[in-house]
């Protein structure tokens, strides 16, 4: 149902908003002001409540009008012949349900009525001539017009008895008399005919419009008067209540003042016996406000002032303003204090001297090298001046801000009789100690935590599909080539318990990422395809899990395929030490179908059972520690790191050290992309606020304050740089021959830029493993982010090839690369990168395919068509877009899709190409996630002959 605001209801019924709000509150509705909304039924209830009150007032006032209307109706009935039965039924007044008055509608009706009367008066002179002609008409026509007049009079009576709307139509008028002639008349001609009939027939009653208008105006004025009177009464009542509240507050203040006065008199009487015991006479009470004007005598000392009465009563030559200025002047203060520093004002009682609290010296003192005198004084609860004095007696000249060595501190503590102990220095930059030593955990606060489960297996065995089924999402559709290329962490809930899943890539290049996933996991789900069996990466995942000491749950996937053979998988895994519990082993085996959601619940129950056996615990009260799952550089947010909290609770604004970087947690999002303020153990979150992008696999720890975190992060970065410099191999006599031999080897210099840190590591490791005799790969630089001008400059200086993985160069970098003749290779699948570099090293690039960019277009608008897909309306900003070209969808300098065009149109026509500065529409095969401001890059692969 629709809602209405109270001020709209007030406007419709002609009441003030305040009255409507009060009436709504009296009806039990929950409203606050005139802007509150109510349902339509409640609005009708409010309007009807006002209408009921108005009807009662109007009934008494309009009794005379009703009597006059009844007399007119009787006269018309007597003089008018009886029309047809249908006309009588139509002309009867309709019983109208009493409504609330609408003054606006009444004013409009009166205006229309007055306009009609003026028009009728102007046409009377012209109508007199036509009246003589009408006397010769037939009796049937006269009867018909008499019926019209009777109907119009009845319509006027209905107009008097209900609010007029100005659009009332006399339907009965159309049913009587000559229908052919009446259809040609409009509303004005009918009114003129009715007026003429009134002139020709002397016996017909006339309507007194002036009397009726005066009655309406009087009724409206009475209503306005009632409203003004009610508002005046409300204002008077509010003033009375306000005055009453002020009087009550004043009475309460007077009562409190009287009680305070009585209390002071009682306390003064209680102190009189004590004062009488003293030898001095009782002094009169002195007004406190006058004490400020009394000034101390200017005697040289107290005795002299007491002996000499003239000097005691002598006024200062300075006026009161000068004395006040002397208080604000340091020079005058010093001068006057020298004269009368011992003199006290006789009117003020002496203030008691606060005694210094005595603090016991500590029995032991733990010091660190370089402590200052002020720090030592604060620790042993002594004044710095006292310690400086002791040091001076020992022959050491020091100030309170001067640092002391260990021997001096020990001698000082011996003088005080305190046992001094040197503080054991803890390397604050070493965050690895939190992962090896559990002594900082409180056993009373340790609670159960969610298990961290890593899904491992060979390429395309269904790892991401299984996780997709668990999360009811479509993660697998976003991976280029159908393989997962960087780790993802997600959390689901099963049977009231949370489970954290880590999805690792299965490709051989991502060995380090799989090892990293095994190091932070609690349970490993080894997924094996029932039709493929055990593959190389399956064996590698088994070795990683065994090295980490993690229990393994085997999920035999794709059992729905015709060639599935789970028994063969079980026997092959038994050869590698993975024995099923059915065969007497320790590993759980579950046959599933991730695609058709078969036995997924059984797999989750097995995970919870193994987690319960492992007894996974954590302390959520300590400062958080954990591991970096993934890190990347976002264009708008900066460094973004995906963290897995292992101990403690991570909060927003926590100072944190992540690997060799530091910062403060500015924002934190969970796996669903929602902002969170805290993350408990076993929870994956993405954070921002780091000064640099950390490395995937680094540990992180939260520090007490930002100063300590900054110091630890800078120290760790310094140590990492020093270690990198020490690893530089220097030429010696022993390796001289190897160095000369290496100089003959040709090198392929590459610069690697990728979207995430894990992809950078995997790509660099894969390229370095390529073994081609006489050629080796040299990774000059690797980083996260888009290809920029600095990368092009470095590539030109080192004669290197830039390899971009899921990133794009900036327009400035592309222009500089074209000018400097620097080659940029862009890829989205790691297979292609390895194959291309390997064949380049082997010299098997004949023929060679070179990418040629045809043009770029910007998406201006998108249109979603059912059963067709998403159509992107674009404008070509550079070059052209052809029908047979391949396209890349670039969003924030990151390639999100690479494919072919499904259609290319200019308006409604299919075209082969669209040139520069032209608009068109396109559809991309297998991709509907086109958004406004996406960049569409059209390119073709041209075959060139290697020279």
Curated annotation (Swiss-Prot):
tr-type G domain sequence ranges: 448-617
Bias (Low complexity): 76-90, 190-204, 316-334
Keyword check for Cytoplasm: yes
Region (G3): 503-506
UniProt main location, coarse: cytoplasm
Span list, region G1: 457-464
Chain intervals with Basic residues compositional bias: 335-345
UniProt xrefs under Pfam families: EF-G_D2, GTP_EFTU, IF-2, IF2_N
Region called G4, residue ranges: 557-560
Keyword flag Protein biosynthesis: yes
SUPFAM superfamilies: Initiation factor IF2/eIF5b, domain 3, P-loop containing nucleoside triphosphate hydrolases, Translation proteins
Cellular component annotations (GO), alphabetically ordered: cytosol
PROSITE patterns: G_TR_2 (PS51722), IF2 (PS01176)
Protein family: Belongs to the TRAFAC class translation factor GTPase superfamily. Classic translation factor GTPase family. IF-2 subfamily.
PANTHER family reported for this sequence: TR-TYPE G DOMAIN-CONTAINING PROTEIN, TRANSLATION INITIATION FACTOR IF-2-RELATED
Protein name: Translation initiation factor IF-2
Lineage of producing organism: Bacteria, Bacillati, Bacillota, Bacilli, Lactobacillales
Encoding gene (name): infB
């Amino acid at each position: 149902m629709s809602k209405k605001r109270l001020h709209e209801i007030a406007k419709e019924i002609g009441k003030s908003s305040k009255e409507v709000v009060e009436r709504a509150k009296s009806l039990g509705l929950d409203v606050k002001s005139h802007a509150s909304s109510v349902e339509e039924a409640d609005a009708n209830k409010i309007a009807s409540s006002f209408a009921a009150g108005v009807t009662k007032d109007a009934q008494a006032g309009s009794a005379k009008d009703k009597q006059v209307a009844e007399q007119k109706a009787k006269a018309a009935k007597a003089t008018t012949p009886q029309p047809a039965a249908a006309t009588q039924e139509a002309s009867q007044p309709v019983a109208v349900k009493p409504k609330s008055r609408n003054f606006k509608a009444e004013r409009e009706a009166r205006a229309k009525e007055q306009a009609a009367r003026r028009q009728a008066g102007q046409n009377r002179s012209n109508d007199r001539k036509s009246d003589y002609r009408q006397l010769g008409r037939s009796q049937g026509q006269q009867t018909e017009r008499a019926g019209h007049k009777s109907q119009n009079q009845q319509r006027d009576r209905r107009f008097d008895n209900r609010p007029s709307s100005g659009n009332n139509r006399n339907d009965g008028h159309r049913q009587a008399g000559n229908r052919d002639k009446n259809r040609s008349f409009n509303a004005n001609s009918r009114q003129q005919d009715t007026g003429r009939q009134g002139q020709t027939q002397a016996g017909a009653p006339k309507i007194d419009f002036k009397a009726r208008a005066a009655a309406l105006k009087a009724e409206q004025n009475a209503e306005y008067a009632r409203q003004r009177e009610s508002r005046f009464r409300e204002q008077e009542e509010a003033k009375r209540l306000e005055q009453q509240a002020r009087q009550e507050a004043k009475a309460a203040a007077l009562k409190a003042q009287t009680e305070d006065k009585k209390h002071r008199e009682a306390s003064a009487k209680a102190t009189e016996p004590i004062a009488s015991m003293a030898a001095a006479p009782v002094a009169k009470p002195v007004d406190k406000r006058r004490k400020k004007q009394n000034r101390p005598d200017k005697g040289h000392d107290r005795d002299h002032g007491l002996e000499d009465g003239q000097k005691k009563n002598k006024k200062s030559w300075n006026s009161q303003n000068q004395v006040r200025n002397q208080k604000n002047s340091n020079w005058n203060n010093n001068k006057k204090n020298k004269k009368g520093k011992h003199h006290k004002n006789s009117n003020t009682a002496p203030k008691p001297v606060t005694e210094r609290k005595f603090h016991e010296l500590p029995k032991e003192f733990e010091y660190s090298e370089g402590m200052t005198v002020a720090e030592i004084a604060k620790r042993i609860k002594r004044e710095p001046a006292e310690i400086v004095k002791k040091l001076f007696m020992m022959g050491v000249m020091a100030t309170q801000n001067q640092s002391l060595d260990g021997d001096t501190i020990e001698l000082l503590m011996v003088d005080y009789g305190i046992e001094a102990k040197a503080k054991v220095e803890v390397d604050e930059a070493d965050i690895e100690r939190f992962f090896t030593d559990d002594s900082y955990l409180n056993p009373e606060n340790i609670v159960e935590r969610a298990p961290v489960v890593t899904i491992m297996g060979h390429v395309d065995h269904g790892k991401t599909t299984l996780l997709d089924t668990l999360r009811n999402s479509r993660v697998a559709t976003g991976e280029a080539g159908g393989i997962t290329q960087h780790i993802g962490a997600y959390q689901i809930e099963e049977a009231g318990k949370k489970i954290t899943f880590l999805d690792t890539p299965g490709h051989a290049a991502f060995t380090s990422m799989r090892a990293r996933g095994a190091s932070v996991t609690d349970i490993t789900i080894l997924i094996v395809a029932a039709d493929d069996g055990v593959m190389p990466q399956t064996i590698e995942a088994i070795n990683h899990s065994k090295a980490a000491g993690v229990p393994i749950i085997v999920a035999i996937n794709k059992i729905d395929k015709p060639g599935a053979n789970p028994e063969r998988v079980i026997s092959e895994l038994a050869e590698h030490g993975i024995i099923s519990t059915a065969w007497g082993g320790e590993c759980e085996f579950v046959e599933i179908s991730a695609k058709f959601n078969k036995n997924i619940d059984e797999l989750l129950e097995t995970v919870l059972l193994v987690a319960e056996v492992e007894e996974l615990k954590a302390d959520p009260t300590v400062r958080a520690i954990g591991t970096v799952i993934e890190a990347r550089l976002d264009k708008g947010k900066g460094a973004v790191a995906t963290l897995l909290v292992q101990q403690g609770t991570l909060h927003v604004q926590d100072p944190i050290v992540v690997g060799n970087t530091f910062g403060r947690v500015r924002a934190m999002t969970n796996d669903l992309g929602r902002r969170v303020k805290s993350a408990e153990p076993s929870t994956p979150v993405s954070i921002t606020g780091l000064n640099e992008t950390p490395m995937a696999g680094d540990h992180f720890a939260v520090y007490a304050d930002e100063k300590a975190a900054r110091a630890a992060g800078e120290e760790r970065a310094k140590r990492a740089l020093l270690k990198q410099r020490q690893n530089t191999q220097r030429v010696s006599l022993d390796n001289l021959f190897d160095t000369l031999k290496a100089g003959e080897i040709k090198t392929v210099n590459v610069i690697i830029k990728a979207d995430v840190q894990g992809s950078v590591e995997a790509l660099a490791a894969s390229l370095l493993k390529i073994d081609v005799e006489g050629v080796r790969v040299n990774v000059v630089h690797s980083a996260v982010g888009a290809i920029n001008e600095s990368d092009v400059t470095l590539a030109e200086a080192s004669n290197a090839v830039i390899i971009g993985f899921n990133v794009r160069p900036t327009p400035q970098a592309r222009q500089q690369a074209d000018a400097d003749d620097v080659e940029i290779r862009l890829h989205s699948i790691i297979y292609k990168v390895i194959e291309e570099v390997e064949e380049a090293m082997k010299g098997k690039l004949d023929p060679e395919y070179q990418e040629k960019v045809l043009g770029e277009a910007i998406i201006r608008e998108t249109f979603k068509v059912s059963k067709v897909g998403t159509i992107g309306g674009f404008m070509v900003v550079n070059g052209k877009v052809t029908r047979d070209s391949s396209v890349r969808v670039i969003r924030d300098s990151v390639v999100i899709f690479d494919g072919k065009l499904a259609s290319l149109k200019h308006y409604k026509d299919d075209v082969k190409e669209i040139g520069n500065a032209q608009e068109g529409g396109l559809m991309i095969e297998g991709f509907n996630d086109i958004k406004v401001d996406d960049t569409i890059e059209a390119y073709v692969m041209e075959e060139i002959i290697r020279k």
